[in-house]
Amino acid sequence: MAKSPRSVVTTGTKRRRAKVHKEDEPVENENLESEFDVSKKESNGATEPGNEPVASKRPKRAAACSNFKEKSLDLSEKDSIITIKESRVEEKEIEAVNLTRTGPEDGQPCRKIIDFILHDGDGNLQPFEMSEVDDIFITALIMPLDDDLEKDRGKGICCSGFGRIENWAISGYDEGAAVIWVSTETSDYKCVKPASSYRSYFEHFSEKARVCVEVYKKLARSVGGNPQVDLEELIAGVVRSINSNRSFNGTVTKDFVISSGEFIYKQLIGLDHTAGNDDEMLATLPVLVALKDECKSRAGFTHLPAMPSNGTLRIKDGQDKGLTEDEDAKLARLLQEEEEWKMMKQRGKRGTSQKNIYIKICETEIANDYPLPAYYKPYNQEMDEYIFDSDIGMYSDDVPVRILDNWALYNSDSRLISLELIPMKAGAENDIVVFGSGFMREDDGSCCSTAELAQLHSSSSKSGREDPGVPIYLSPIKEWVVEFGGSMICITIRTDVAWYKLRQPTKQYAPWCEPVLKTARLAVSIITLLKEQSRASKLSFAEVIKKVAEFDSRHPAFISSKAPTVERYVVVHGQIILQQFADFPDESVKRCAFITGLLAKMEESRHTKLAIKKKSQQMRGENLNPSAKMGPILRKKLMRATTTMLISKIWGEYYATYFPGDTKEEDQNEPKEIDDDQEENEDNDAEEEVNVQDEKATRTPPSTRSRKSSADTRKEIKWEGQTAGKTVSGEVLYKCVIVQDLSISVGATVTTEDDSGETIMCFVEYMYEKLDGKNMIHGIILQEGSQTVLGNAANDREVFLTNDCLEFEASDIKELVTVNIQSLPWGHKYRKENSEAKRIEKAKAEERKRKGLPVEYICKSLYWPEKGGFFSLPYDKIGNGTGICSSCERKPVGNEFKLLSESSFVFENITYNIHDFLYIRPEFFSQGEGHETYKAGRNVGLKPYAVCHLLSVHGPAGSRKANPESTKVKVRRFYRPDDISSTKAYSSDIREVYYSEDIISVPVVMIEGKCEVRLKDDLPNSDLPAVVEHVFCCEYLYDPANGALKQLPPNVRLVTLTRKVPASKKNKGKQICDIELGGSDKPKDGQSENCLATLDIFAGCGGLSEGLQRSGLSLTKWAIEYEEPAGDAFGENHPEAAVFVENCNVILKAIMDKCGDSDDCISTSEAAERAAKLSEDKIKNLPVPGEVEFINGGPPCQGFSGMNRFNQSPWSKVQCEMILAFLSFAEYFRPRFFLLENVRNFVSFNKGQTFRLTLASLLEMGYQVRFGILEAGAYGVAQSRKRAFIWAAAPGETLPEWPEPMHVFASPELKITLPDGKFYAAVKSTAAGAPFRSITVRDTIGDLPAVENGAGKPTIQYGSGPVSWFQKKIRSDMASLNDHISKEMNELNLIRCKHIPKRPGCDWHDLPDEKVKLSTGQMVDLIPWCLPNTAKRHNQWKGLYGRLDWEGNFPTSVTDPQPMGKVGMCFHPEQDRIITVRECARSQGFPDSYRFAGNIQNKHRQIGNAVPPPLAYALGRKLKQAIDAKR
């Protein structure tokens, strides 16, 4: 194309004129003109007034090759005559330009250059963009712009070292093909073809230019683009467009686009001045800005040496110092980019093939083995696989392995096509492009055969998989492999993005898959045949063909009984057979006579031979997957979170500043769990040795520090004003002190230093004069937000009051700091008012910063790491100057032991008297006992506390000091049913104990708290979902000598029945016995007005609401759930609630529109459209601010959960963003209380950023916040389920304490690390003991009737009564049993299940190593072939195909129980089936009356995603206690 100065172009940086090399005198040329200015300089070289002509030093010529290897050749006389067409050479550029002139020219001349190189003044080749940094010159063949490149080379003029380059530009945006221009003062040059020696330098820049044009095409409406695409879609589209003729993999391509983001942005914003009326301004386009930001965030991803290729470093002197730093930085960046580009190319050139020839399969020869042509019809919601690019790394050769189910392959015309047409070796040339579609999901570690799945149904033959995966379309398939072992045959394909294990093809494509599988089975059979021989080469090709023809017709590899037919089949499909032989580990088989004969036959057939290169041949044009042509309306759109302005601002500003892994300092403050196993390994805690010894955690308690004085005695110090009283020790108090010229008052904030020299900020609580005359300050230490768990998510102007104090002399004060103790009005009514006040405050702070004034801090919360939270400031107790420090008052009372009398003592702040009932650690009675642990049986052998009756106290003899070790108590031991047998424990009340005559002496140190023992008739008649009281019942006497149980004699009296618990002793430790004889706390008719009006978001089937309502705390009036079956289940179980089955983003948008706050709402257009379409009834029923008192919910956990290894997909990222919508509900409604529930990985997900920002968001709203992780198994369910919780309470409310774990459970203490090496655990581990034993599998499901594999009857009869305490509670008054239905296993898995022994701990390791015959006649291995081979890498695959243990616990409940899943222990202890829906529900603590909706997959999903109601009950009960105490 002819260069047009008025065409759409982007330009490089205009260079500042450097000093001339040849002349000493400076030459000024500050106003260089762009080559695209409307007014052009004439080509006659005239200069502007006041400027002298520039004389350039003639650069050295680029180095030429000086060493040629000689080789003798015999040439004919004709061949030895060479006609040389030499191009004319000119020294001066102006003459070369004039000689290539073809007609009249307006403005700056335009030429093209070929065989060009760019170099510096010393002749060293330099990258293209180096012209922005250094003087760069051109050596090239200059040609007329419109001449043919090759035919008219004779018209070209060779010119060496001309220029220098003044600037460069990119054009061709409207045409869709990048054109690169360089300009000197004389002419503009179109860069057509670099010299071979310069190609690698120029290629990098030309690729960047090409990407710029592709991005423009995707965004500019004038060329059919869509400026509203998101970043993932933009990158995927660009990569797909340019990938059709790229030589390296897609991961590098995507990274290359991102790494060029800043370059792209700078180029495209230059086009804004040419934009049409319909085009948006590119400079402010969100997706383009996001691309630039993503590029910047990756800066520093690699740190390569920034050295020129010649190894020398040039330092330029005498230039403008103001530019030195910028130019040095640019030089380093360009050199690093060049190095990175070279690494990309080197990686892209790596081949995997070992031979240079690949014999192609002929399509016409195999056509008869395939069906008639058919065409693929794509799903409406297929997504581009590039969106799911894993971002493994810029230079990684690795790509992830995923699974593709329900798949089909087709060409660019959507015609179904065979895999055989794709070369099986990477790098092979190929003229056919094959695409694919299917449902992608995570690699779950399963080893299902492609062959097996093509013939059999999936593991759930009735309704298929619950989670089919994400529908996607693939980029071109690069290679494929066949893996085999035993009877298993697996096909895996590779694209630019991932390896895909192929599972079941679509029904339509199955006939196209069968010939490939048939050939693979044939290859396996031939290998088996050869291995049976004494040596592999014993059988020739013909003999093998003969033996294959003798196969029985029922043989899986049967082709035909005619040898010619078999031979034809083997030869035309030979490449599959060759690959399988090449991968076989036996060298004799690889080189056998059969393979030699097969290769010869294939060559005889004149099959096409494809060259295998180090890089694959580039395809011309855009070979796009035809599914990509579907309109955007048909493709699945991911809805971004709807947020309020405040939440968007907090999270947006954070991500604009910080990025994952920026600095080591950030990592130090990242909260994480000490027990950092992934979610899927939650049950592997048992595989570690559980230490049942008491774990006395070493915590750093709040303290009062007195620093050693380093007072400056020269400072003038004096008290000001009258005295303000005296301290308790008689020292005089004052309100103000003058230090030099500083006036320090009580309530001010000052800085001083501690003994280590660290500067500390202190709030002045009071000041006094010591008896020796020293002027003293008692201060409470303030911490900056970055020093708390918030880390870098904290407001940099906010400080937090702590419980640490410091006493220091007034002369130690360094400076006075402004800290405003902030208290804003609370409630939804004040949202906008407070927001405006904060905006003004922030503007003021920024103005102070610009002026260099000191920071003015704010303080509105107390940081209490020992309690894991932030609390409201005690405004009325701080800064009073009374000599009493609120921080000192909050310090925990010491745990010292006190022997009060011969009948009472104090231990760990609990007072014990004779006749009290107490707990003794189980280790005192079971020292030396051990037990075997295995997956889901880890609670076996763990014991609860022993219940004892205190009879007497005996201090140490003589003058020895009394301590917990030397002081002993005599107690009567009460036995538990589990001390007798597991059978007795199963049939007894969990609270039952047995009186005995055993009197023992126990050291006080073994005591763990107080409890009560009552007669059974005096127990409260409770139907609570969890046991929460330290109360036991007794009606039998036990004799351990003979094991006899007798009725409790009438003369035995349980003394504490006649004693009431003093009010002063209530709510202290384990002596809590505030029994509510009314039983259930669930709100009764007429009492619901005392419950909190609750909104449950991400409600699921209602596990959280169920538990909270049973506690009497809340009444769920509104619920939001996206999935219809779960929403139906919620509505059925909570008919009083208005259930909105809709995306929460739509609901929030609708609510804010309803209330007239649309201007404060940030949402997608889709959310706005769907909100506008809601019915009037729905909108009428929507809650509004002021109605909601409590918001709770668990944002989708797939992105956070380690169980979902596919958590980097955009969908998971969007789900993670749902935390923003959840927080926006809280920000808009401002309820009194807020509860967030999530998987434990939520705390450490995304390097803790999400967790920190959640806390920071709630604090910015004004809430009090506390956080912790709890184990559901310790609250009365037979399941390991660790969950993270965040409580928030409005100012003036009381944050609830964490519920005390009541059941023994083998889980470690769940700690969250804090800055400075501290940690926080919400509750202690109960592995060493707890008030009650753990709930077992038998307790949970032992009464349920037997059902078969695939049982589907929705309602059946129980058949027998409940036995265990748990069963009686969970059944309540239900007469029939619902949802006792089981997923149906396929035939092979059912056979495997039947072979798993019915004893504890058995799994796939116990399967016999043998083959079984299926009903189809196929012989298959009982042991899944892939498990033994990969066991070492996967913890021996413990639990897969595992049986539950009657005396153990369930593993973590999942949404799809299956024997080869992440939690594979899903077989009933005694029946040959997967556990039923009802059994899963019971493992979560759902009562039998609770109903689930949808099909069996829906029901399992609802249960697996739910919060166990007993855990929710325990949480709700503690909040109810906090509210009641305040009342």
UniProtKB/Swiss-Prot annotation:
GO biological process: DNA methylation-dependent constitutive heterochromatin formation; methylation; negative regulation of gene expression via chromosomal CpG island methylation
A GO molecular-function annotation: DNA (cytosine-5-)-methyltransferase activity
Domain BAH: 742-874, 910-1049
Catalytic activity: a 2'-deoxycytidine in DNA + S-adenosyl-L-methionine = a 5-methyl-2'-deoxycytidine in DNA + S-adenosyl-L-homocysteine + H(+)
Keywords, in A-Z order: DNA-binding, Methyltransferase, Nucleus, Repeat, S-adenosyl-L-methionine, Transferase
One Pfam entry name: DNA_methylase
Protein name in the entry: DNA (cytosine-5)-methyltransferase 1A
Organism per entry: Oryza sativa subsp. japonica
Classification lineage: Eukaryota, Viridiplantae, Streptophyta, Embryophyta, Tracheophyta
